């Protein structure tokens, strides 16, 4: 389906809606004939496609549009290749999973365009009854219809799937709920697109440099007007009662009030139906749901069924050749879909850009529109807690959410979520459904005198130590006196790793672990997002090691993502052209860690490589620490001390080799690195922090020798509190990557995986999320297959891993789909010799 995918992406995502004419035009496109110039211009953005090939693609597209109901026939044709209706459900129609590669093609198409239009098209072509329609439209995704998967996916009485990495606010149908809200409140005067500072559709931005937020808002007004007009037509509203609508003039903001009044009129009719059915009055969510209200009002999916029903009715009118849907209405629906997909591409990750920052932009927009409307916000939890569990056999669901400022506020919020899901209390939820609190990482904002790195976040987490102690106390009381099962079962971190090392959270993790252990709160467990986003593979591995040691993760903890463990080092550094650009500080830390970790774990480094790394380290150390005594020089000068003598004293204090220990400079620096889990303020004085200073996990155990060493303490103090060290350390350097260094990195990966296996620390893998963010481009290259790759790779391990979704609303996936994706990818994969595995 590569050809179909390319054509549909061009016709639905790359064509501007202004270039589609409602009336017949020789120069513009319509639903059954796209202009050649427009098509070829859009096709230039296709990877690995020459101009002649694009011409062929255009000819194929034109033939496809002519032999069917234009673009709508093309959509149906793709839907029929992968979907079927069976047993009252929409199912994947894959007859031979071991030979048929259609599923992975479908995954690419549905990631780009979603599944809603394809499900609506195949339904419209089958024209089911009203009761069946409501069931079909409530399905968040097609069902897997393959007997061999029944046991794996927990069907027919088998144990279900565990969802161990599930961000609550990133897992609802992000676009559909926001779009429904927008189409029903377009005229309310809210700044719906306040976070849309930049467009994610890069190719469109290049082509239309004058685009701005007003453009995307204006197109939304047009879509809302098109939607209402088409709704009135297929609903049979007499023309004299329809909202005034002209095919011959542009819609503008002057029409907004009239448009919103009419929308509210139809929503009001929905509210009357609710009043009649339930004896109470609530706001209608979507006027387009009108005909299905009596069979959908009590469904968890009621908030998004209206838009799906609208799509279904339009497709049905076209396929059934409804005379009310003329040429003009078909073009109007095409224009609507173009705007629909244009805005969808700004809320669901569809672009090919990798890295966590790209994903984070989408993540930050996920509630931009519904933020203004509490009645839609409460359906986020219903969609996540009820709908997704209803359509998948999930045995346990760990829902991650960010805590509020205080423990009482957090508990109150959780109780509200439980009520929104439709449960009366925690007793009914049992052990299979609970919350994990995740704390967002934050980059440091700059250097502040006498403040450590990331001081703002450190101060927040210091306050959270007390709040989470109180939360544990509250849950213990509920369990002891009321028998209520604790709702918060674990702690995690989230958001981007770059610029926020595990050391920032170390004190919090140690303090809460100790408190939970003292109070026998054995339901509290630990995980940490790490090794997902990194500027160098070695940097990602060091972060994993820092998490293990600084946070002192206990047995049966987990790491979120951990991709650095299993990434193919050769392919990674080849992709980077064998050059790494990092700050001096990070490079210095990485080299010292590579040397120190290898020494401690018996990994032999070739003499030539060892010399290369030590020489590079010495250069960095001199540039950042030895030569950076200007601020000390000024301080000593002001106090009347001889400047040269002062410089010599400070340099000796900071970087001199402790001859009594006969250690090299990198060894002392590596020992100082081990102190980074300690509370930085304890090192402001030159005195050694004593064990009596340990409070709330301020000092970690097992590193007393490094703590005693004056040179190590000076390194650590300068790392945090020396302005010149931090400024010089931020300067960027290029490291050339050698073949023997790559081989060393592979050994470091293997050793770390072995350590985690022995410690029984598992990895929460997220196939689609990792594929979108990580540095690999095929699912069979997923790092999990080295973490647990029995009979697959020479250097694979037997770690505890789980498959999860991460942010399924942004990545357009499901837990079943993640399992099937990896299954099919493995069936299609080849070994180094090109043979099937």
What role is predicted for each listed range?
Residues 1-837:
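Metal-cofactor-binding active-site regions of metalloenzymes
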